[in-house]
Amino acid sequence: MTEFFMGLGLSYEWAWGISTIAGILLIALPLMLGVAMIIYADRKIWAAMALRRGPNVVGPLGLLQSFADGLKVFLQETIIPTAANKGLFLIAPIITFTVALMAWAVIPFNSGAVLANINVGLLYVLAISSLGVYGVVIAGWSSNSKYPFFSAMRASAQMISYEVSIGFILICVVLWAGTFNLNDIVKAQQSHVWIINGFVANPLLFPMWVMFLISGMAETARAPFDLTEAESELVAGYQTEYSSMAFALYWLGEYANVLLMCALNAVLFWGGYLPPLDIPVLYLVPGFVWLLLKILFFFFIFSWVKATVPRYRYDQLMRLGWKVFLPVSLLFVFLVSGYLMATGHFA
């Protein structure tokens, strides 16, 4: 895109700046539209599981319900508790929302179609996604209320606990692919096992995908790991004191993170923008379509689990992360490393 603007007579600096802004808009605007649609889909799936109809009034089939909700919160007043730290209280949801968007910069939507094709893309995702907990912790502390504070403590412990096992899982992927570049990781999955595109067909990496999927639910605080928003215990958790657009930013950030986790499942284990099978006719379908279908598939799994699995207790959540996922993921790091060294394919 930079070359295109340079061809119009612009200097490199101007062309790079305009192309970067255009790339950000090309990702951010469809992402926000996608978030609105998956909120609608989430409510529809949850309703279907409970034998209800779900949103069905605003627009055809209720498709405009999310936009109506957005307009409603936009017109509401932002109420700040008198005892709250005003500056931190308002900046916390902005941090969560901004961090959720920044992580998408390195997701490859097709071969070469990525905003920032950096060599440490996976490390970038880990670093940026780790910053999301600051928005939650700041909200819990600045609200000066016991329910948000308890929620913030839970959120920090939960996210840190599962980031450790996620790190070991991603080490297995990096060892096999030999790179931190997400685009190269996708290419390394082509015909990985026979004609199957994806590390998920690998017996050593399939358990890692299952653990990554579950850890992703815990990392994004989705049910059954939504201990930070346990209504029966913490009202609405760290969001209890929020209203209007500040509350909406948390919702947008939460669902953007869920979509990001679905995209990472697709990119790291299911071949990303590659078709499921390495068959020439399947490559006629554009790569971004395959990636979108995989993201929707994983989002359905997230919603399905949310509607069917009861919430974990806090001690069960910690036990699963530290006593099950951590040792198992560490064991598989040794297994994958040993296999690659024994077969002479160590990257």
From Swiss-Prot:
Its EC number is 7.1.1.-. GO terms for biological process: aerobic respiration. It catalyses: a quinone + NADH + 5 H(+)(in) = a quinol + NAD(+) + 4 H(+)(out). Keywords: Cell inner membrane, Cell membrane, Membrane, NAD, Quinone, Translocase, Transmembrane, Transmembrane helix, Ubiquinone. GO terms for cellular component: plasma membrane. GO terms for molecular function: NADH dehydrogenase activity; oxidoreductase activity, acting on NAD(P)H, quinone or similar compound as acceptor; quinone binding. The chain crosses the membrane at residues 21-41, 87-107, 120-140, 160-180, 194-214, 259-279, 282-302, 324-344. It is found in: Cell inner membrane. PANTHER family: NADH DEHYDROGENASE SUBUNIT 1 (PTHR11432), NADH-UBIQUINONE OXIDOREDUCTASE CHAIN 1 (PTHR11432:SF3). NDH-1 shuttles electrons from NADH, via FMN and iron-sulfur (Fe-S) centers, to quinones in the respiratory chain. The immediate electron acceptor for the enzyme in this species is believed to be ubiquinone. Couples the redox reaction to proton translocation (for every two electrons transferred, four hydrogen ions are translocated across the cytoplasmic membrane), and thus conserves the redox energy in a proton gradient. This subunit may bind ubiquinone. Belongs to the complex I subunit 1 family. This is NADH-quinone oxidoreductase subunit H. It comes from Novosphingobium aromaticivorans (strain ATCC 700278 / DSM 12444 / CCUG 56034 / CIP 105152 / NBRC 16084 / F199).
